Amino acid sequence: MMFGRRDRFEYVCCSGCGALSLVSVPEHLGVYYPPEYYSFDRPVLELRRPLAAAAKRARAAVVLKMPPSIVHRLVAAGRAPVLYDWVAGLGLSPSARIVDVGSGSGSLLADFARQGFTRLLGIDPYLDDDAASGSVVLRRLAIDELTGSWDLLMFNHSLEHVPDPPATLRAARERLAPAGAILVRLPLADGYAARHYGANWVGIDAPRHTMVPTHDSMKILAGRAGLRIKRIFYDTHSQHFWASEQYVRDIPLLDERSYCVDPGRSMFGPAEIAHWDSMCRMLNEEGRADAAGFVLVPAKDFA
């Protein structure tokens, strides 16, 4: 429904953990990732003022040493970018080796670069070509082609797209530096909006999402890869509501009437969006959100 194709796909819900899995992956999955797909439509941007970059690195070094609870309050108050909430408590430094798996055009890595991080790699097998901009390097690679060891491997809404998530996480674990961590951000099938909207929930994103996990299935998935969950944070947003409401009304995400295309033509007014924003803040605080970040570290007893 993102592009209005209205094709139908079948998912099975695990009776044990509640995760959703795509029954049959389309033979030509690439047609569902057209050039305008949002992961590839934003150029890499980089902070290029040396003095400003030095100041950002100094601030990053301070914030990265703070406990996650304090970092969360800074982010909630608008005094620090949200990416610090993701990496809080991991012992990273601005020179940490960070790779974003399924990086698309690298816009998220550019956000890290603006905050003073200096060793940033994005890998994506669907990139047209390798590219570089300042401290951000993009390479056309799959994770099993990645070499070296890394302090942080990130899957920012990419793990749910791969055909074999357990194998992908095992490959990530094998590339971790000592004391390294894996960050997985993705939708959750046991969240409030997922249960409320069912097949019209935007988080399914068929057929691009080959699976949509739950809390229980993430624990199982991590264990199969020799990992354990160190921390969970929640970051759902109002799109889970207004986009799902559009799907109920047969309005695709990128339709001219969609809120994300033209808020002025949307059926939703500021009061409704504000209400959903408020609901999302509540769901995030209560752990009932439809999107979360899982910080994974090696399980010590894994052989």
Label the model's feature ranges.
Residues 216-235, 269-272:
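A SAM-dependent methyltransferase catalytic signature shared across enzymes that methylate proteins
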Residues 22-23, 30, 107-109, 191-194, ...:
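Short catalytic/ligand-binding loop motif for oxyanion handling, primarily in non-cytosolic enzymes
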Residues 20, 118, 228:
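Residue-level detector of anion-binding/catalytic polar loops
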Residues 1-57:
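N-terminal juxtadomain amphipathic helix
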Residues 2-4, 234-303:
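A C-terminal cap/extension of S-adenosyl-L-methionine-dependent methyltransferases
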